[in-house]
């Protein structure tokens, strides 16, 4: 295996934020820009030789190009195997699930979350650790320091990998496995929730739902889980095909950018009982009822209050956590349940140490993110599935 070393010079401003490095596509597409940042990640790893890396993104513009570059660089960095989502697709919570289930060393997720996509819009990259969660500040600070002094990056010359076909191929000595991006994640959700109960709800003639995937990454997941495994009518999922520019929309599940969904639920003639939407990389969510929207602060409180309805959590919650700007509704629920409620800075990565220590089971933040200890990222479809089982109509099934 021949490794090519390419001389480079630092770019300014490659400092990761709370969710990795995000810049305009035109910035990332500069020769060496992505390569410098990826090499700076790899230069701060120890023990990755022969190990597994998980790779994928939300399908936005530049996703496919970036994946081919990262695969070649991963081979040069000594990884033994890369699991990459088919067509380059892998939602953020699904990536976390795959990392954890497959015992991967870590993962690279390509997304700018709820920011718009396209040649003139945004792209992003972040590294997740072996626990499936975002890298901590010590690691990201070290990556930034490396970007300021980098002088070369390394790759293995190779033809592009066919990302549209499931199967195995090689770059040098490294095995590349193109995987079904939905399988491990769907299996995990089914282990947490009573899918038979949800399916009964979705089959009721007096209950209709709509899920707006916003032409983002959760489209294939929602089609496979809601319409496939749970039997919701075809057409329940709208805007379900991931597009590089999200169909010209802004993949942020809020009343402004998901106005069509909100309007449909407010229309008494629509026949809809329940609505939901998720963002670019599938980790945020919005829950909509008939003429009302569930605020993120209330969503995590409702989820915690109804934990006994969910098989995976019915034996009790270790504790709960919320970000500082999130309202105190969760605190009230925790007090009633007699469990601890922790407050963290903004950024999902701050929940990671609490989850890993077994101190909390459920987490929520002000920016439409909710999740639990099943992965180390917030999780849009998890929140939708959980909410299904808390609906009064479902308890009567």
Q: Where are the regions that the model predicts?
A:
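Glycine-rich phosphate/diphosphate-binding loops that line cofactor/substrate pockets in enzymes
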Residues: 38-53, 196-204
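Conserved phosphate/anionic-ligand binding catalytic regions in large, soluble enzymes, centered on
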Residues: 15-25, 217, 364-366, 381-382
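Gly/Ser/Thr-enriched, mixed-charge loops and adjacent short helices
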Residues: 2-11, 32, 119-269
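Proline/glycine-rich low-complexity loops and linkers
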Residues: 87, 138-183, 289-374, 379-381
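N-terminal small/polar loop signature for handling phosphorylated ligands or for N-terminal nucleophile
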Residues: 54, 58-121, 224-287
